[in-house]
């Protein structure tokens, strides 16, 4: 694999901070550069923040921004950090854009975390590493990467009862 992996930041649990005074979660800055350094990433990754929002607040206009950035991106390998609550919706929008050739010849991986990186016990670092590996090894298409597994955009759902992603049965 040659070239740079583009890492688009959209917010989600990955980047949430904890307010010790009132117990709320909020966004400050992305942790992605710190995570890449901590994970000793030796792949050329360019980080770009598109937005810092909870995925429950994401709407079609936000998805259009993500889609447009993926379409214009010179890299053929893209990782998108995303909140897990609506990740399938964004994956579907991107997958449909690839199906109708609005986006072509790109491997796009959406990745999230169930626990904020700032908490220390987060699954985010593991998920990010897996997403970067999948971006380099999977054929062009749109995928969701969580917990060491990857799923095609049209065959994934979040199982809220167990807190994991799974294939649609």
Please report, for each region that a protein language model flagged, where it lies by residue.
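Active-site histidine-anchored catalytic micro-motif
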Residues: 2-169
């Amino acid at each position: 694999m040659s070239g740079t992996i583009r890492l688009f930041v959209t917010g989600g649990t990955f980047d949430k901070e904890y307010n010790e005074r009132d117990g709320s979660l909020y966004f400050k800055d992305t942790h992605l550069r710190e995570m890449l350094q901590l994970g000793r990433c030796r792949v050329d990754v360019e980080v770009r923040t598109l937005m810092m929002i909870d995925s429950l607040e994401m709407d079609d206009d936000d998805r259009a921004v993500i889609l447009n950035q993926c379409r214009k991106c010179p890299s053929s390998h893209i990782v998108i950090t995303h909140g897990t609550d609506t990740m399938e919706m964004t994956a579907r929008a991107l997958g449909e854009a690839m199906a109708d050739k609005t986006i072509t010849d790109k491997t796009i991986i959406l990745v999230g975390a169930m626990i904020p990186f700032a908490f220390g016990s987060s699954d985010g670092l593991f998920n990010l590493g897996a997403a970067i590996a999948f971006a380099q090894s999977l054929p062009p298409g749109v995928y969701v990467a969580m917990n060491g597994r990857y799923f095609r955009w049209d065959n994934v759902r979040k199982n809220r009862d167990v807190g994991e992603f799974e294939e649609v049965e």
